[in-house]
Amino acid sequence: MRQYELMIILDPSQDERTVAPSLDKFLEVVRKDKGDVVKVDVWGKRRLAYPIDKKEEGVYAVVDLKCESATVLELDRVLNLNDGVLRTKVLRLDK
């Protein structure tokens, strides 16, 4: 298994208290494939560098996880299908 860092920018209209439960729903993909969610860090609402879908702000979250590459592809697919997710970025961490 490899280590990955996932940054997610969520729709700012979503309440910050509901961010963690909605992230849990997405991260169930990782847990189902016997991966491990190491850390979830919700940064909160921040101003975007440039507008995304005519929105000036977004709710940032950073997730450290350990899983297989196929699991990351499936997680990215699930996140991109959701309308509440503005942007995602997955980075593979070096050992």
Curated annotation (Swiss-Prot):
One Pfam annotation, family name? Ribosomal_S6
| InterPro entries (UniProt xref) | Ribosomal_bS6 (IPR000529), Ribosomal_bS6_sf (IPR035980), Ribosomal_S6_plastid/chlpt (IPR020814), Transl_elong_EF1B/ribsomal_bS6 (IPR014717)
Q: What keywords tag this UniProt record?
A: Ribonucleoprotein, Ribosomal protein, RNA-binding, rRNA-binding
List the GO cellular component terms: cytoplasm; ribonucleoprotein complex; ribosome
Which molecular function terms from Gene Ontology are attached? small ribosomal subunit rRNA binding; structural constituent of ribosome
Q: Which GO BP terms apply?
A: translation
Which SUPFAM superfamilies does the entry link to?
A: Ribosomal protein S6 (SSF54995)
Q: What does this protein do?
A: Binds together with bS18 to 16S ribosomal RNA.
Q: Which family does it belong to?
A: Belongs to the bacterial ribosomal protein bS6 family.
Q: Return the protein name.
A: Small ribosomal subunit protein bS6
This chain's source organism reads Corynebacterium glutamicum (strain ATCC 13032 / DSM 20300 / JCM 1318 / BCRC 11384 / CCUG 27702 / LMG 3730 / NBRC 12168 / NCIMB 10025 / NRRL B-2784 / 534)
